[in-house]
Amino acid sequence: MIWMPMDKKDQLAELISNAETSFYNGQLQEAFSLSLSAIKLDENCADAYQYAANVCMSLSRYKDAIEYYQKVQIYIMLITQIEMNL
């Protein structure tokens, strides 16, 4: 995740937490909507893409799920490279 003001970080954390809760409560459309809101707030948030992908898998939207999972993989690789260079 790229540096951002704390209130934006808090907002992102809340969106991800709510997406997770909605997903595990079977509220898939709500989880997807929250995930997309998180992505709009921070397009580098792997967790947001992860929940969007999980929802798509649950709804048998496999092509969309693959696209979101690929973004998760890209961001994880970038984070790993950054951490290795620190």
What residue spans do the PLM features occupy?
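TPR-adjacent "capping" and linker segments in tetratricopeptide-repeat scaffold/adaptor proteins
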Residues: 2-14
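Register position in tetratricopeptide repeats
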Residues: 24-25, 58
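Conserved structural position within tetratricopeptide repeats
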Residues: 37-40, 73-74
